[in-house]
A protein has these predicted regions:
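Serine-hydrolase catalytic machinery in alpha/beta-hydrolase-like enzymes
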Residues: 3-90, 103
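The conserved beta1-alpha1 loop
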Residues: 7-12, 127, 181-182
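Short alpha-helix in the alpha/beta-hydrolase fold that links the catalytic acid
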Residues: 21-24, 187-197
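Active-site nucleophile loop of the alpha/beta-hydrolase fold
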Residues: 40-43, 123-133, 208
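Gly/Ala-rich beta-loop-alpha elbow adjacent to hydrolase catalytic centers
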Residues: 92-97, 101
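Acidic catalytic loop of the alpha/beta-hydrolase fold
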Residues: 131-132, 182-189, 209-211
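Short beta-strand/loop motif that positions the catalytic acidic residue
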Residues: 172-173, 177-181
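Catalytic histidine-centered segment of alpha/beta-hydrolase-like enzymes
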Residues: 209-221
């Protein structure tokens, strides 16, 4: 039986190489999944001079209107990756990568980008940033509003000839989600806000800050934690 395919998205001012070190060198997720990495489309100053070129999913100092356009370009960048190397069973996101992965799972967003179904079956988020923290206050909300208006216009045209049956729609994301958060993370509150966008989030905590805690994962408690991450990938919703 083939391993599930997992798309891995890095955080702000980071890159795919760092994510590879997190997922393979620390978490060893390559033991249970075929991992695919993607660099964000925009250059930025790296968070550490030793990691090479930094990349980000939005440009920090842009005005909100411009950020919505760069956000759209980043989402299209991910959709193209899905088209070329997917389909993917799940997605891993760290920090800002967790935010943009979550945003793509919003029905209005992936619908406006031409996807007829949710792009992933499950999502694994590490030290995730909620939308306002990741993209700037109100940027994602305005973007989702524009996507919803576009989707509603297309739906209305279709419904003229084919009235739909009544259906309930939840604003919460329905795919299984596992959230690994640092107890000492400066953005812990934002990570907790991100969990509230999901219908049934599963929560895990480590004792470090805004990082994948390499040393902690060498302990007995850390081994148990990584085993739960791997179990979730193999059977989403049952970690």
């Amino acid at each position: 039986m083939p391993m599930p395919k997992l798309l891995c998205l890095h955080g702000r001012r980071s890159n795919a190489e760092v994510t590879e070190m997190q997922c393979q060198g620390v978490l060893e997720l390559d033991k249970v999944a075929a991992l695919h990495y993607l660099d964000a489309p925009f250059e930025s100053t790296a968070f550490d001079k030793d990691i090479g070129g930094g990349r980000s999913w939005v440009i920090k100092d842009e005005p909100p209107e411009a950020k919505q356009e760069t956000l759209r370009q980043s989402l299209i960048h991910i959709v193209r990756k899905i088209a070329s190397d997917g389909p993917f069973d799940g997605v891993y996101g760290f920090s800002q990568g967790a935010a943009i992965a979550s945003l793509l799972c919003e029905p209005a967003v992936h619908g406006a980008l031409g996807l007829t179904a949710p792009p992933f079956r499950f999502i694994l988020l590490v030290c995730g940033a909620d939308y306002d923290k990741a993209f700037g206050a109100g940027v994602a909300q305005e973007f989702m509003g524009a996507c919803a208006a576009q989707e509603d216009a297309a739906r209305q045209l279709q419904e003229v000839q084919h009235p739909p049956a009544a259906a309930s729609r939840s604003s919460l994301l329905q795919l299984p989600s596992l959230h690994l958060m640092g107890e000492k993370d400066d953005i812990l509150a934002s990570s907790q806000e991100l969990t509230q966008r999901y219908a049934q989030p599963q929560l895990l905590f480590h004792k470090s800050g805004h990082a994948v805690p390499a040393m902690e994962l060498c302990t007995g408690e850390g081994v148990q934690l990584t085993n739960r991450l791997r179990s979730f990938i193999q059977k989403p919703g049952y970690a």
